[in-house]
């Protein structure tokens, strides 16, 4: 059975999920016992689960579907691009028309001093790359010791090694010897949470 088009009953999907899918920030045994919520479809700002319950997606698919679901015009453009050139990297002095066109448009829309665009597959990857790029920049400038990054306590920047280090969330730091060296955290801008009157 093709699970992408022919949906099994919720309990069977939950059993397969528990057997094979690792969820982030989750106690897997507890989730396996109760079963994950299975999202079946989405439209606009709403999600529908495999039992037919509809939810407002206030997290925009975890912050990456801020234009809403089911946008036909975007699906059409994406399908056209997938047929022409679904993906290609820009390593090894190579580029492609979508990267050129989007970079030019973003530079046009951005303030005058922001004219160069670097693409990444996720926010976490972008943050990790920025840590490396900033440190490399200062090393090339002859200041390799200028490598301290200041971030906020309780900030979430992603779950990769560098991004979790930037995020000042102690439970994440305890999962793997984080933060990486020279990332320091200052208080979050929350007067009451920090003990203010």
Can you describe what each PLM-predicted range is?
Residues 2-43, 93, 98:
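Active-site-adjacent loop/helix segments that line or gate small-molecule/cofactor pockets in enzymes
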Residues 10, 54-143:
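Glycine-rich loop-to-alpha-helix module at the N-terminal edge of alpha/beta enzyme cores
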Residues 16, 21-22, 63, 87, ...:
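Tryptophan-centric aromatic hotspots in well-structured domains and transmembrane helices
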Residues 20, 81, 159:
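Phosphate/oxyanion-binding loops and surfaces in catalytic or ligand/nucleic-acid-binding neighborhoods
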Residues 23, 84, 191-192:
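Active-site/binding-pocket entry motifs
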Residues 36-57:
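Active-site and channel-lining beta-strand-loop segments
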Residues 48, 68, 163-167:
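Short beta-strand-to-turn element immediately C-terminal to the catalytic PLP-Schiff-base lysine
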Residues 104-197:
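PLP-dependent aspartate aminotransferase-fold enzymes
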């Amino acid at each position: 059975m093709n699970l992408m088009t022919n949906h099994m009953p919720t309990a069977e999907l939950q059993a397969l999920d528990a057997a094979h899918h690792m969820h982030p920030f989750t106690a897997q045994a507890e989730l396996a016992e109760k079963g994950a919520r299975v999202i079946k479809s989405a439209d606009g700002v709403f999600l529908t689960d495999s039992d037919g319950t509809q939810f407002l997606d206030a997290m925009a698919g975890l912050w990456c579907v801020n234009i809403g679901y089911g946008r036909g015009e975007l699906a059409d453009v994406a399908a056209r691009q997938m047929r022409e050139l679904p993906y290609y990297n820009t390593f090894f002095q190579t580029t492609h028309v979508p990267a050129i066109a989007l970079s030019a448009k973003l530079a046009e829309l951005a303030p005058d001093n922001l004219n160069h665009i670097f693409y990444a597959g996720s926010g976490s990857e972008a943050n990790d790359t920025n840590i490396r790029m900033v440190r490399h920049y200062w090393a090339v400038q002859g200041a390799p010791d200028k490598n301290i990054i200041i971030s906020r306590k309780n900030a979430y920047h992603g779950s990769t090694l560098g991004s979790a280090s930037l995020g000042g969330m102690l439970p994440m730091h305890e999962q793997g010897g984080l933060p990486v060296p020279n990332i320091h955290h200052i208080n979050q801008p929350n007067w009451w949470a920090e003990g203010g009157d």
